[in-house]
Amino acid sequence: MKTLSTLPRGVLFAAAVLVAQFAHAQDRLVPLQARPDAGSVQIVPNSFSYHAFGLAGLRGPAPDLRPAGPLEALKISPAFEESVPVVPSPGFYAGDATNPGDGPTIVSAEFHPIYVNKPPSHWGNPARFLIDLGASEFIHVLDQYVGVIARDRYTLGASFAAQYPIPANNTLLPTDILNLVHAAAAAGGSGYGHLYHVFLPMGVDMCFPATATSPAQCYSPDNPATFDFCAFHSSATFSDSVGHVLFSVEPYQDVSGCSVPPTGSANNQLIDSTDNTLSHETSESITDPDGDAWWVHNFTILNGNEIADECIRAQVTSTGAVYWDYGNVDLNGHPYTFQPEYSDTVHGCTYRPI
């Protein structure tokens, strides 16, 4: 988890839409405009934190890397999951996440896609995935962390068609993301009942500038020297009435280092690359929205990992190409290719709750 103490000012404004209409707006896009050059909306100092999702097999929290092989449907044995041995003290399961500070989680929420400058099909069909994710059994793997087992807690809210000026260098900064998120949250709602997903179009990079203690961190497939992450989830508290906002950023995922293989996935490379990352960031946003809830706190190589970080797996091909390596799984009756999540209950990665 990283925190930025100060940020330049940004500005934004949302299309005038009544929040009450959003329950009926799931099948349409709400127009949204955000400008970086007018107004003075600010965030509360030290309130902007983020956790990045590293590249396949290259950076990040010790991913499992194996030679490429055929992708198969994943089958999880109930007998295995229900017979996890107890480790006698002082032993422990190194991957188990804890929440010693009782940080908040997302018990229920509306998901809000923000599509920047392109139609939703540019990224596949993220809204369909979010609907299926919220209605699936898989989402209940997270119940153990949020402490609630009720169904239908995560649903699709308003989706936004955002127009935003892209700089000449094709690189957005944190202030640009905050402009977009603030504009959407001003219309759609804020707090722990809303989770915004910002989708950046192909060819647009996103960077956290260098600081005195760390180099620049970027999604920049066109510049391998700074290409450090595929996506991230974050939160920030704005100093106006919008207040606290939870969000993730998914740049274009059908690029080397962030994608599933070109063949063998449930849908196609674009759809499943997008949905795999979206699942990763959504699960971590729910269980650790502000960076102070569920992650590995013990002092092992896994320290700092959130529950999705622990279950990333990549494959390397004979040509040296690296892809995410997961099987095909049904969500709400529709097939997808995406990663499992870590479960403290089974002390391992799983697609189904116990």
Predicted regions and their residues:
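Active-site-surrounding "flap" and adjacent substrate/cofactor-binding loops of secreted or lumenal enzymes
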Residues: 110, 119-164
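Solvent-exposed loop/turn segments at secondary-structure junctions
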Residues: 117-121, 202-207, 252-257, 281-284, ...
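Bacterial N-terminal signal peptides that target proteins for export
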Residues: 2-11
